[in-house]
Curated annotation (Swiss-Prot):
Protein name: Putative metalloproteinase inhibitor tag-225
Cellular localisation: Secreted
Domain NTR as annotated: residue spans: 21-158
Any Pfam family: TIMP
Keywords: Disulfide bond, Glycoprotein, Metal-binding, Metalloenzyme inhibitor, Metalloprotease inhibitor, Protease inhibitor, Secreted, Signal, Zinc
A Gene Ontology term for the protein's cellular component: extracellular space
InterPro entries: Netrin_domain, TIMP, TIMP-like_OB-fold
Binding site residues for Zn(2+): 21
Function: Complexes with metalloproteinases and irreversibly inactivates them by binding to their catalytic zinc cofactor.
Phylogenetic placement of the source organism: Eukaryota, Metazoa, Ecdysozoa, Nematoda, Chromadorea
Length: 158
């Protein structure tokens, strides 16, 4: 009986590891330069089970849609004068979707899908190069963004 219990525990751990989000570690500059947009946002509303807007590459997937206020934009595509106030992310953890809370502020990065939909995932978020300040595969709540990183995102040249 103990062997069966131990086998079930090991199987559960292996399944969790297999289904977990996997990201490649990147430097602050690499994450910033690979992103289409980087912004200090305040999350107003989170809505589940959303499809991406018309013209997006990913079809039929369940997404979370966040309505945000862009407090400060550090990077945006040159063809956009402002960033849209909606951000989409996968609702499934294995697809590296972000679970962030309404009413909180974050440093977020992502890409533009289709004509003008902002899309973000856990991988590629702009984090400090000093990993003692945050964990890898993380999203930074703005109050935890080190002062050095706040200054750095204002001056990175790609």
């Amino acid at each position: 009986m103990q062997n069966l219990s131990l086998s079930l525990v090991i199987l559960s751990v292996l399944i969790a590891v297999t289904l977990a989000c996997k990201c490649r570690e990147q430097s602050t500059k690499e994450s910033f330069c690979n992103a289409h947009w980087v912004s200090h946002v305040k999350v107003k509303v989170r809505v589940g089970k959303q499809g991406l807007p018309e013209g997006s590459e990913r079809k039929g997937l369940n997404n979370l849609r966040y309505t945000v206020q862009h407090v400060e934009v550090f990077k945006k595509p040159s063809n956009m004068t402002t960033l849209p106030d909606e951000i989409f992310t996968p609702s499934e953890a294995p697809a590296c979707g972000l679970k962030i809370a309404a009413g909180h502020e974050y440093l977020l990065a992502g890409r533009v899908e289709g004509p003008n939909a902002l899309y973000t995932v856990l991988c590629g978020q702009v984090l400090p190069d000093d990993r003692s300040q945050t964990s890898f595969e993380n999203v930074l709540e703005w109050k935890n963004v080190p002062q050095t990183l706040q200054s750095q995102v204002k001056s990175i040249k790609c």
